[in-house]
């Protein structure tokens, strides 16, 4: 085989393999994109579940400690929504509730006890803030979803649940007709996740309160 024949053979092989290599690279990139998307969806679903659980328990009163003679404004004390106060105009919200006779947990998994309350009420809050430790102007993959809860001295503590949160919105919507529950309120939660490059995932969930008076 002459040198010319070798060169021709190599060229033909390259022509045949090049499309296959491009397809393989494209498939690999799509696989990575799919895995990143699934991870973002999983994180968003976890966050929405935690926030939904907090809304459902908002306003819970233990019958053993409940004082019916004490009038409270449930809309102000048990659940509060603050619009456009967080990262990139994200909303935030907080809830308060009494402790049940069982085992309750806050948004970071701490078992709730009396020393983690204020005025016998547990507190949970959710807000999106800029990622800590990142210089201003640096490119980041969204903000951080912060869980606000009380420590064993009843002091407010902030804990990062996850990064990659681009936006959080909380909207109160009309209660379902025929619910017959004047205290029930319904909220739409929306969470936009990002990898900071190309991917953006948006998930929503509708949650109704169960314990408001």
Regions flagged by a language model, labelled:
Residues 1, 21-24, 31, 126-128, ...:
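Broad hydrophobic/π-residue packing in well-ordered secondary structure
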Residues 1-62:
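Aliphatic-rich helix starts adjacent to a transmembrane/signal segment
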Residues 8-9, 18-20, 61-65, 127-137, ...:
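A generic short-segment signal for beta-strand/edge and adjacent turn/coil regions
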Residues 12, 16-21, 25-28, 69-71, ...:
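Compositionally biased, low-hydrophobicity segments enriched in charged and small polar residues
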Residues 28, 33-34, 48-49, 61-86:
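Solvent-exposed N-terminal domain segments of exported/luminal and surface proteins
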Residues 36-39, 56-58, 65, 83-88, ...:
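Short linear sequence signals and composition-biased patches located at protein termini or domain-edge surfaces
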Residues 71-167, 202-204:
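Surface-exposed loop/linker segments characteristic of extracytoplasmic
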């Amino acid at each position: 085989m002459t040198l010319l024949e070798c060169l021709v053979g190599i060229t033909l092989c390259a022509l045949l393999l090049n499309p296959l290599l491009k397809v393989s690279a494209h498939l690999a990139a799509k696989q990575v994109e799919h895995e990143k998307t699934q991870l973002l969806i999983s994180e968003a679903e976890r966050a929405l579940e935690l926030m939904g659980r907090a809304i459902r328990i908002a306003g819970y009163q233990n019958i053993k400690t409940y004082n019916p003679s004490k009038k409270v404004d449930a809309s102000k004390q048990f659940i509060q929504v603050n619009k456009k106060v967080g990262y990139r105009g994200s909303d935030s919200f907080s809830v308060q509730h009494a402790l049940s006779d069982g085992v309750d947990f806050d948004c970071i998994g701490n078992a709730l006890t009396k020393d983690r309350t204020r005025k016998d009420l547990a507190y949970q809050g959710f807000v999106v803030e800029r990622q800590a430790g990142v210089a201003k102007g640096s490119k980041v993959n969204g903000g951080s979803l912060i869980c606000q809860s009380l420590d064993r001295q009843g002091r407010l503590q902030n804990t990062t649940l996850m990064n990659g949160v681009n936006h959080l919105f909380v909207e109160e919507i009309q209660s379902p007709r025929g619910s017959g529950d004047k205290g029930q309120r319904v909220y739409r939660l929306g969470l936009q996740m990002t990898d900071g490059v190309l991917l953006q995932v948006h998930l929503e969930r509708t949650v109704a309160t169960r314990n408001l008076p």
